[in-house]
Amino acid sequence: MAIVSSSSGRKPPRRPEALMDPQQAPEEVVSRPEDKLRPQRLDDYIGQSELKQVLGIAVQAALGRGDALDHVLLYGPPGLGKTTMAMVLAEEMGVHCKVTSAPALERPRDIVGLLVNLQPRDLLFIDEIHRLSRVAEELLYPAMEDRRLDLTVGKGSTARTRSLDLPPFTLVGATTRAGSLSSPLRDRFGLIQRLEFYGQGDLEAIVERTAGLIGVTLTPQARSSIAASCRGTPRIANRLLRRVRDVASVRGGGGGAINQALVGEALSLHRVDHRGLDASDRRLLQLLIDHHGGGPVGLETLAAALGDDPVTLETVVEPFLMQQGLLMRTPRGRMVTDAARSHLAEAA
């Protein structure tokens, strides 16, 4: 499977605690064997069982017809495996996967160049697809629906439209903000699937698999502790495991399985607690309690007080805190829960 990657363009500001930031780019570097952590096939992809069932049937049906897979939109919090799933789909279909991101497609020729170079049944993956420009979207409409590219040649009275036929292809879009997609674009995806946060069992399996790939051994308690502290996110689980490995190599005396004490030391070093909250999470909750009586507080006010970006708070920080029952969104703003107060008191 060939992968062409294009990733230019600005990204939203990141939180200081990059270790626990699911938007932070994964550390896989394909030139280093130990970093080949991505699963290659659906059978190797841990978790997201309903998603795998739906996409597995779609892949088998497309292969049976000898046609391209229908266009796929994957959405959900960052770090849950949307890019990995796109690559897995290409592998299952036996085609090339071209990878780019919406901010990199600033000019019409950027997306035209990708589309005209697609081979039959190839897969084009666009990350952050909600950030596509209007011009790029309009070029995609006929490409997705009619496998046709409409180009305007010339200007003014001499302008004319030229149509180019495209081979059957699959567009896989990924987004953390499905509601920000325009209806015409969203409606052209035949498969729209959400990725959910991972459960403890699946995360332990991911940690165990990654540990084997990078050559470390964990006690069951250590594996469980890492899985419980990674915010339900495989990308963070793999990153935490690397930091635990660092501590073990320096403090562990060499040899033997990594135990829970070493995991605890690594988490403490990076200010991550046993539920996966980092210093920024605790600061947000504490600010709501200390300065606003627990809320409600508007998103913009909260972001300004924290010196953070509202979009990052809404798409990266809040989903996990709400999933953990520590934060509520109300029509009047954000509020902490009794569970958040108890957790902060316990951690104090």
UniProtKB/Swiss-Prot annotation:
InterPro entries the record matches: AAA+_ATPase, AAA_lid_4, DNA_helicase_Holl-junc_RuvB, P-loop_NTPase, RuvB-like_N, RuvB_C, WH-like_DNA-bd_sf, WH_DNA-bd_sf
GO molecular function (one): four-way junction helicase activity
Major enzyme class: hydrolase
CDD domains associated with the record: AAA (cd00009)
Region called Small ATPAse domain (RuvB-S), residue ranges: 199-271
KW Glycoprotein (keyword) present: no
Subcellular location field: Cytoplasm
GO biological process, one term: DNA repair
Enzyme Commission number(s): 3.6.4.-
Catalytic reaction annotation: ATP + H2O = ADP + phosphate + H(+)
Region (Disordered): 1-37
Composition-biased stretches (Low complexity): 1-10
Cystine residue pairs: none
UniProt comment concerning the protein's domains: Has 3 domains, the large (RuvB-L) and small ATPase (RuvB-S) domains and the C-terminal head (RuvB-H) domain. The head domain binds DNA, while the ATPase domains jointly bind ATP, ADP or are empty depending on the state of the subunit in the translocation cycle. During a single DNA translocation step the structure of each domain remains the same, but their relative positions change.
Protein name: Holliday junction branch migration complex subunit RuvB
